[in-house]
């Protein structure tokens, strides 16, 4: 056909009780800036419809639980603890980029072997890259699991673990750090009538397709609710 299909690309493993997996492979795409506020550096990936660029990019995710990020019992009780962790990481990434939108980056094999990359390949990320020791400043529970995960993927797929691949920091918004509670049957907020928490921002999806499916379900339930008013 005229357009390439979505890439069949999936890597999944477990490292120290947490999932490490690929997310949203974009063949023939771009890495783009995705910050939504000051003092943040966030990246995301996309493909145009013809998937016609020279690059492919995928998120690499480490499953994260509240006990991984909190520093006290009191903090563990904070319902926004994961959001505060996300904010800290995004600000740290911005600081590592000299407080600009040039993204910290490292060649994959260098990252796995705790080496600084003295040069970087060309990239689709328009603001540019800055060589950075991601293995050193990223949260250790993330970097260590990524390193072990990449080693496993390299054993399972020849050519995966290579210095031709570039890690660009950081995609921190694969899923919401907060879930707004809703009823399992009506999909309505448990306290506020007529409010239907929906999609990625509310914590019920992680990607375009799942967000679309959840949106359709919520629209149907919203229509049923309005009929009864």
Question: Could you describe each region identified by the protein language model?
Answer:
Residues 1-229:
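Residues forming the flavin
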